[in-house]
């Protein structure tokens, strides 16, 4: 069986499983409608990153229970690596063990929507203080990830964003301006490289997670604003292929050879402990940079626009949010908790703790954001009406396979010169087009 056949079979199997689970969720398990309830009593909340986020959630819950003394929140921490399977298991067992409220990321939102596990929250948002207060690009990402054009199935709370990190001390020593255009980026990569002195202008990700960062660099340089052109992906558009060629040409010319196998942890460690001028990652590594380099030696900016005066083009990052589960017997109380957690004060508190971009625009002027310039710049770019966000198809059952393990070895071949950028893009595009066609067929 060839890889294309295996992938088609795997996608069909995944879709069949979702349809079967949907049928289960629509049976006599109590997950069809649930109840509004009295707006008081006990509700259950599943934290989708239990452990690292437990402390901040307990602070928010304490404040919520102070405001609503007739509501008690039962907090259940779920490890981030187990959360999707935990939801699936609860649905398959009948839905009664699902929480009232759960943390839901866009990477697996479509899976929950397909199984009928979540209530739409569009009308609830419109009838609440959240109306018009959530960053539009995050709302659009959640809507796209759910696989339905008109409904939101979670309230966005935070997002990450691709960031170009650079060593301000090395740039100052070389009398180079900030890499806020692609011309300045490539010039700095060249001028900061001294292989004999083990100094490099850039470090890239060639190991696990490599394709996600390549997509960031491709669409930011090409300026293409949509992942789809009709039913076909734009991934192998000639402008994206040209951008990928420029990106991979950096390998070993201005980057360490070890980049071939670097995952994010190795790449970030290499940047923080060596003489490397630039790194493309996301806001999540800011704490490490500051801890190891010092705040005065590091800066982070959004990836530059494709050309001077053009709008910035950003590839969507997974958006975290809160979902209202359909089986809840106390939706009124559950919604009070969601609205409270997404309010400006609580949303700011949560995102300050995790170092992410708050979804509520009311948090934009808080002191902690002003004191974290990379986060402030990311928030401003995401909230800029001119910014174009390329919505990745998280709703495709085979998206993770295609964009990760199935094609990461191929990306390494491109870096090594064993495969052309065009051949790589065409291969991935063919697989995505087939997955999209299969998904549309089952949408009926």
Predicted regions, residues:
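Short, low-complexity disordered leader/linker segments with a strong preference
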Residues: 1-44, 66, 127, 430-444
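Hinge/lid segment of periplasmic solute-binding proteins
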Residues: 106-161, 214, 299-301, 371
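C-terminal capping/gating helix-and-loop segments adjacent to ligand/active sites or protein-protein/ligand interfaces
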Residues: 378-431
